[in-house]
Amino acid sequence: MSEPLDLNQLAQKIKQWGLELGFQQVGITDTDLSESEPKLQAWLDKQYHGEMDWMARHGMLRARPHELLPGTLRVISVRMNYLPANAAFASTLKNPKLGYVSRYALGRDYHKLLRNRLKKLGEMIQQHCVSLNFRPFVDSAPILERPLAEKAGLGWTGKHSLILNREAGSFFFLGELLVDIPLPVDQPVEEGCGKCVACMTICPTGAIVEPYTVDARRCISYLTIELEGAIPEELRPLMGNRIYGCDDCQLICPWNRYSQLTTEEDFSPRKPLHAPELIELFAWSEEKFLKVTEGSAIRRIGHLRWLRNIAVALGNAPWDETILTALESRKGEHPLLDEHIAWAIAQQIERRNACIVEVQLPKKQRLVRVIEKGLPRDA
């Protein structure tokens, strides 16, 4: 065991060790989330969590970290950048023949990577505090990570409900380490959104129903990742070519002009997932899907939902005979897929009959212009 440190020294060491482990920022807060409890309950009461039953099932436990690890006194909150080089946001979004995958999911699944780093951080603290009990969390337990990150000074909550940082925007993962030592806490930062509502107005489906409140049932990330059944028909045309997640509310945000590229090789895009041809993706067998998505966050939605999402994107593409052929080729595999294929075919035929060459989505066109002007490095 190393020489004991006083708590102020230990807090500084923890932040230093966190940076050495690859985190871009480390903050410390207490476990009091009592102010978040009524907001969480109101959100659940309005059914904004959709079919994510586990959110309601755990209830207020999410706002009580000390109940997850009895004796917890502090939460060490960390963030890690995930934006890859050559993100190709605009070039992918404006090409309806390509599939858009949320940029956090292009590389290796972040859960295990962050959890292992947090575990190492806990072990480093233990060298100076042998009686320490700790537990790492990365989307792996019912915990309100964003309010904790805000209290720990990592940023403020934007109107899209994500954490924003003045020097890094919002393209980063969050993680937590629960500890049972009374470390000095950090102070929250001043919010920086002001009267800006860009994220609310750009959302393709109007999922940000009021500042800081997202109705998951309308959110493309929820529809393409969490929803197990049929995607509501009225929302399908608004999804465009987004087949796994959506980044629009982040891309329009002025603070993401300061976004930082990741230094983690594991977050580099896998070629088959980066600006892929929709028709090629739709031809993947389940074996090919599992092979390409091994170690990826995408794998958990399964092959069926993957095809469902792509069918919607093909339905949103301009008329093309090869799209019709591709859609027809997968009929009869599963009722859920058949329903989305039938819708996509109807969309294609309607465009053919009306001689529609290009589908106009004003919000997407505006977003592409903003990206090309404000985020040229990542366009």
From Swiss-Prot:
One GO cellular component term: cytoplasm
Residues in the signal sequence: none
Gene that this sequence comes from: queG
Protein name: Epoxyqueuosine reductase
GO biological-process terms attached to the record: queuosine biosynthetic process; tRNA modification
Domain of life: Bacteria
One Gene Ontology MF term: epoxyqueuosine reductase activity
Cell compartment(s), UniProt: Cytoplasm
Free-text disruption phenotype from the record: RNA from mutants accumulates epoxyqueuosine and lacks queuosine.
Family in the record: Belongs to the QueG family.
NCBIfam families per UniProt: tRNA epoxyqueuosine(34) reductase QueG
Keyword Isomerase in annotation: no
Domain 4Fe-4S ferredoxin-type: 181-213
Pfam name, any one: QueG_DUF1730
The enzyme's E.C. designation: 1.17.99.6
4Fe-4S as UniProt keyword: yes
